[in-house]
Amino acid sequence: MSKLSEKEAFLFDRSIDQFEKGQYSKSLKTIQSVLKKKPKHPDSVALLGLNLCKLHDSRSALLKCGYASSIDPKSQFCWHALAIVYRETKDYNNSLKCYQNALAISPNNESLWYDAAYLQAQLGLYQPLFDNWNRLLQLDSSNLEYRLCFTLSAFLSGNYKESLEQIQYLISSCNLSPLVVSRLISFLPRICEHIENGSQTVLEILLMNQNSFLNNFNFEHIKADFAFRQKNYEESIYLYARLLIKFPNRLDYSEKYLNSLWNFYKSGGLALDLLLKRTDSLIKTFSEILQTGISVLIFLLSKNLDYDFCLNHLISYSMHHFIPSFISLLKIPLKTNDAFSKKLITMLSNFREGDSAKNIPTHKLWCTYCLCLAHYKLGDYEESNYWLNLAIDHTPTYPELFLAKAKIFLCMGEIEEALCSFKRSVELDKSDRALASKYAKYLIRMDRNEEAYIVLSKFSRFRFGGVCNYLAETECVWFLVEDGESLLRQKLYGLALKRFHSIYQIYKKWSFLKFDYFTQCAEDGEFQEYVELVEWSDNLWSSTDYLRATLGALTIYLLLFESKFNMYGNKAEEISHMSEVEQIAYAREDNKKIMKLQKIEEDKIKSYIPSESEEPLVIDEDYFGHKLLITDDPLTEAMRFLQPICWHKIKGWGFLKILSSKLYKLKGIIFCYYALTNNIEGLHQKANSLETSVL
């Protein structure tokens, strides 16, 4: 490998400088002038690849950087460049491998260790992440960012005692802002949950640093939680009461206050009559907060205590403020407690016949509507419909009444009547997006997609492909799932795959959120926020919407694997019986139709003039999903949906597991096949055969 001359080295350095300033086109031209004379200089080839990557030519960038690292496998610069290109293309596994190769050459390079930490955090490799930050801390023990990141990685990797010790050190010895100190102290209770006898230690730290809290109520919240854990219920009752006075809308405080009362009563520290007085006092004190009253009622019901006063208050308050939604909050006790259901209906009937309901029109409407909802929750649809008709006769312009009527008709199997009621509710309030979305959802479930698109178009912006692409762009997952399943039922497989792939891309985008936030959260002391992000991200691919999309995609790809003619949907059988010449002619005509429809959509874009505030409109070259259908390897495409799923987190979904096991078997992934079919014996046999072959 020849070295660069003095002039070439100068040009190489200039190209590096231009690259660091973001002048990628200039940097590219400069390095190309070097490569004209030294076409196999590895660092120059790698730099060329980096520029191509930044200029959005990732494929060429990977080829160049891969070629550079093959020319000189001992070049740290080449491996680093290849790692960056992989990282930019979000191939984090290969990027991390390249960083490891670079670190093997330059083990004391802080920049490489730092960059690798981002990848380990994204991939959930928390023990290597802990070791990584430990290494960086050894290289620069005075770096505050390194220590904060090391502390957070210690918690994530399960080294809780180390995390606790580091927080103590940070609070006592480092120059942190009051906000960061307050956040670190607030994170201590989360650590003590994992340390045996850690509560007392953490409480001592909290008391020593009480003045560090920017918000004293944050300290009292933590102190109250500690008191409850240590079964000091008298103290926790007092502290939660103080918190409720300050934050009356915090439902968790009212629930914890009630639990403290109950545990104090069970331990013999509180008489039953005092317990009931405390609950009555809670209702009276926060009489304007419906959620607090509901939580008290559910608490009294769950403990088999007298709840008449509470229920009377809730009905009276809801009647005077016309809040029928309180019935919906009682969904569980209505369905599981017959005595409560009968008492509620009796009380509502009495209020309806009372003087106040007769004198104030809205009171009568409220009572009638709530009786309808109560019977609906109990499954008595005829009685529910009777009361609802009375409410509609009283106030025929209230949209919620027609929405309730639509739901009742759906439960009774009267589909057309339900859709008419939905339509009427939307007409009464044309600006209600939520109401329109519910109507559209049921239209889609009835496979009346075009009507649903018209309803939703009133709340959409102009985009290529209309409302469907706009909702995909705005990550409206419920629409993509419902529309995809509807199109699948209609055997419009191309469009259905388009919806399911949109969901996959959305979830993939969400899964990358961890990448940028590790060091940011660590530096700001937002440990709790990052841990919550990790927990959310870990369950992302197990969500119901993604599993529904996966089930739909697998169904289509397995059909395509069975026969290529299934791509034609309802006409599959007819086309399969045609001669080869006729099939080719039909395919040609089908392609022409798709191209014509595609051109119509593109012409709409060309005639549209966007405003200055709007982003340029993007044309989808495969709007109808035709390219997704003509794949040569449908099984590999289907595997893309299965790869991120953690099956041990999924309960139920039997049909999805059956289709997945079929796919695994076809692809020869026997371990996954046996695991999904619960064939433990087959799993052991396969493992033993592999062990024997290795030996």
Swiss-Prot record:
Gene3D superfamilies, sorted: 1.25.40.1010, 1.25.40.1040
A Pfam family hit: NatA_aux_su
Localization (cell): Cytoplasm; Nucleus
UniProt cross-references to InterPro entries, sorted A to Z: NatA_aux_su, TPR-like_helical_dom_sf, TPR_rpt
Gene Ontology process terms (BP): protein maturation
Keywords, sorted A to Z: Cytoplasm, Nucleus, Repeat, TPR repeat, Transferase
SMART domains per UniProt: TPR
One GO cellular component term: cytoplasm
Gene Ontology MF terms: acetyltransferase activator activity; transferase activity
TPR repeats: 8-41, 43-75, 76-109, 111-143, 145-177, 217-250, 262-296, 365-398, 399-432, 477-510
Oligomer and partners: Component of the N-terminal acetyltransferase A (NatA) complex.
PANTHER family: N-TERMINAL ACETYLTRANSFERASE A COMPLEX SUBUNIT-LIKE PROTEIN C418.02 (PTHR22767:SF14), N-TERMINAL ACETYLTRANSFERASE-RELATED (PTHR22767)
Function: Non-catalytic component of the NatA N-terminal acetyltransferase, which catalyzes acetylation of proteins beginning with Met-Ser, Met-Gly and Met-Ala. N-acetylation plays a role in normal eukaryotic translation and processing, protect against proteolytic degradation and protein turnover.
Protein name (database record): N-terminal acetyltransferase A complex subunit-like protein C418.02
Organism: Schizosaccharomyces pombe (strain 972 / ATCC 24843)
